[in-house]
Regions:
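N-terminal cationic leader/targeting segments used for protein routing and processing
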Residues: 4-6, 29, 37-39
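Bacterial N-terminal signal peptides
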Residues: 19-30
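N-terminal secretory signal peptides that target proteins for export/translocation
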Residues: 1-13
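Secreted/periplasmic proteins
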Residues: 39-263
Length: 263
């Protein structure tokens, strides 16, 4: 069977159609490429917008703990951002022993690492970092210069406002091994309160603090158990970085989100 011969006009239409299709494909590829180039990256599922701090010693603390009754910063009945932290949280983040002392307790994945003997009113996934932007004179004076999100709303609406913290309630991703858990900042420490080079630096600076194996953050019992620390009230190396609200995945840490400000 002899195939019919296509006219030159038909061949021209086919050629133009193929060229147009090729151009559409090329444009789509270019658009996708530009989108990827301009989007934030992910490192182990965590946004890399903020620098990663590696191999930082974390200690465990909890609402109601009395670490040193003689020290101005030795009690977790209050925090630098909440003078009624114990009340705001709902009580001892653990249990009261026979001597009336607030103790920590092992947490279980089956209930999202929540406390077993009380019902928290605020997020049990909390931590501190050594930058106090409210009660430390240097921390407050420098916060608009050193805190990366200071120019964003709602923070930019509170310049000079000592009743509004840029640090309180900010999210942090904390990684130990292949496990990442999230928590909100609710206090400042350990031991240092204006260590901007470590907290906000981009060169993986070591903390100024030399106590507790140069600890660079305290984490709550919920974060301790979520990360699989070997023991309660333990010291363990972790990696951490700040995370924007929109980049926090659902998990037990989003069951209760703390929104209260300085009080």
């Amino acid at each position: 069977m002899v195939k019919p011969h296509r006219s030159s006009a038909a061949r021209t239409r086919i050629t133009r159609t193929l060229a147009a299709l090729a151009m559409i494909v090329a444009v789509n590829v270019a658009v996708i490429g530009c989108s990827n180039d301009n989007s934030e990256g992910l490192v182990d599922g965590v946004s890399d917008k903020y620098p990663l701090h590696t191999n930082i010693t974390a200690t465990t603390f909890w609402v109601g703990e009395i670490l040193d009754p003689t020290a101005s910063d030795g009690s977790q009945v209050l925090s630098t951002y909440d003078s009624r932290w114990y009340e705001s949280y709902g009580g001892c983040d653990g249990y009261i022993d026979e001597g009336g002392v607030c103790q920590t307790e092992a947490r279980k994945a089956s209930n999202g690492y929540f406390p077993l003997n009380m019902t928290p009113l605020e997020n049990p996934f909390y931590l501190d970092l050594p930058y106090d932007d409210i009660n430390n004179e240097i921390g407050f004076a420098d916060r608009d210069r050193v805190i990366p999100w200071a120019g964003e709303k709602p923070y930019s609406d509170h310049v000079g406002d000592d009743r509004f913290s840029y640090m309180k309630n900010r999210w942090v991703a904390i990684t130990r091994g292949d496990v990442t858990c999230y928590g909100q900042i609710q206090d400042a420490g350990p031991a240092e309160y204006s260590d901007a080079d470590y907290v906000f630096g981009t060169d993986d600076r070591r903390p100024l603090n030399k106590k507790w194996r140069s600890a660079g953050l305290d984490v709550s019992p919920a974060i301790n158990s979520c990360l699989g620390f070997p023991k309660l009230d333990y010291i363990e190396p972790v990696d951490w970085r700040f995370v924007d609200d929109a980049d926090v995945p659902d998990g037990p840490w989003t069951e209760i989100i703390t929104t209260s400000q300085v009080q």
